[in-house]
């Protein structure tokens, strides 16, 4: 009886964790729900700087699409987190060489309360290089 209850509890916990799973595509689909900051930097300047900034933070670029202005980033599991998925969305604003950068940060598991919100550190690093609007 105890074994059956334990297995039921274990299956329920697994289902709960799996139901909150986030993929890199989910982070991209959440456009508009991240932290948005505008910078005095051309799209080209921002695009060429972002991989360096992400590397400094220990993040790995999983895929990029310059035409869409999308960098998809993954951070593996650690002692404190099951990992994170981050979408960095870059778009041109106006004709004066300004860009809008949105960072959407999601835990790899929806129930992952200790996942890092990468928006703040990414925007802090970018603000060291470019002036915010």
Locations of the language-model features?
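Ser/Thr-rich, low-complexity intrinsically disordered terminal regions
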Residues: 22-133
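Hydrophobic helical h-region of N-terminal Sec-dependent signal peptides
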Residues: 10-15
């Amino acid at each position: 009886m105890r074994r059956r209850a334990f297995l039921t509890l274990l299956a329920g916990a697994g289902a709960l964790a799996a139901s909150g799973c986030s993929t890199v595509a989910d982070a991209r689909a959440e456009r508009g729900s991240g932290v948005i900051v505008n910078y005095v930097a051309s799209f080209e300047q921002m695009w060429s700087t972002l991989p360096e900034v992400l590397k400094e933070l220990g993040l790995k670029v999983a895929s990029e699409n310059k035409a869409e202005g999308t960098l998809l980033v993954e951070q593996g599991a650690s002692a404190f987190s099951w990992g994170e998925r981050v979408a960095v969305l870059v778009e041109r604003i106006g004709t004066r060489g300004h860009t809008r950068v949105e960072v959407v940060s999601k835990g790899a598991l929806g129930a992952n309360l200790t996942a890092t919100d990468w928006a703040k550190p990414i925007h802090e690093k970018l603000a060291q290089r470019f002036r915010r609007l």
